[in-house]
């Protein structure tokens, strides 16, 4: 299975592994995400997910796997439009975006086309100095699907999103300065840093991290006052949790809290 799954404590690591084709994105990745993400969401032992590329491929993902026999083709434009919401890639990316727990992209090299879009379907990005984002679709006479331009503009603003949409690359240092990557590290330290970030997130009360993610994403889509009012309900829901009581007690006693996810 080209989408590899490894468990380290409370951290699940998903690796795009097609190194002979620079981890090109095929339907098997979509199928793997559709199979694994619901399982990981239900697994109480999993508190955070890392998505990365097999470093033997020299890339996070070099884009769509054009040799994949399952690649969607349609007899007509009408058929293609009708099929769009049902495409496995579209469904997989929605699952990734809507996944309740935090997802960290560890970008180890080129993230091109669909591989580029996958990184900012995640919540946090740790970038290697070798990372580079590219959207070549407009140069091929098409558009980035799966919300490729819309999602990017929400991360970095209109100007940089427009630049990337027009085919200009975004290198690691620029991505870090623009806020697309929250951490930029030497290449050989990428997974160490990604695990450090993941383990910190995993150490937090998981119900609180889930609602914090929900609050940030919800706030992008609604007026400020509506988002702020919704936060009050999330706050009150967390007031009733065991982890909230334990965290406050541990703070008073100057000790590490025993987080249970309840």
Locations of the language-model features?
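Conserved CoA-thioester-binding segment of acyl-CoA-metabolizing enzymes
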Residues: 1-54
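Terminal peptide-recognition signature
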Residues: 14, 18, 33, 51, ...
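Glycine- (often His-adjacent) and acidic-residue-rich active-site loop
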Residues: 53-95, 111, 141, 223
């Amino acid at each position: 299975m080209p989408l590899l799954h490894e468990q380290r404590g409370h951290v699940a690591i998903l690796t795009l592994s097609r190194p002979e084709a620079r981890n090109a994105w095929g339907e098997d990745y979509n199928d793997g995400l559709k199979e694994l993400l619901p399982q990981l969401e239900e697994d109480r032992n999993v508190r955070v997910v890392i998505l990365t590329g097999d470093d033997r491929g020299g890339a996070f993902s070099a884009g769509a796997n054009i040799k994949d026999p399952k690649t969607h083709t349609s007899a007509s434009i009408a058929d293609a439009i009708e099929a769009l919401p049902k495409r496995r890639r579209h469904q997989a990316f929605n699952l990734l975006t809507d996944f309740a727990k935090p997802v960290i992209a560890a970008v180890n090299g080129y993230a091109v086309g669909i591989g580029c879009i996958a990184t900012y379907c995640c919540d946090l990005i740790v970038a290697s100095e070798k990372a580079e984002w590219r959207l070549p679709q407009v140069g091929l006479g098409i558009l980035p699907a799966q919300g490729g331009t819309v999602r990017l503009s929400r991360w970095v603003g209109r100007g940089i999103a427009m630049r990337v949409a027009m085919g200009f690359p975004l290198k690691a240092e620029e991505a870090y300065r623009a806020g697309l990557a929250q951490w930029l590290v030497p290449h050989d330290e990428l997974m160490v840093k990604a695990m450090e970030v993941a383990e910190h997130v995993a150490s937090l009360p998981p119900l609180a991290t889930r609602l914090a993610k929900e609050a940030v994403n919800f706030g992008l889509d609604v007026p400020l006052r509506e988002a702020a009012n919704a936060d009050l309900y999330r706050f009150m829901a967390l007031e009733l949790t065991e982890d909230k009581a334990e965290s406050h007690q541990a703070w008073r006693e100057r000790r590490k809290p025993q987080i249970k996810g309840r």
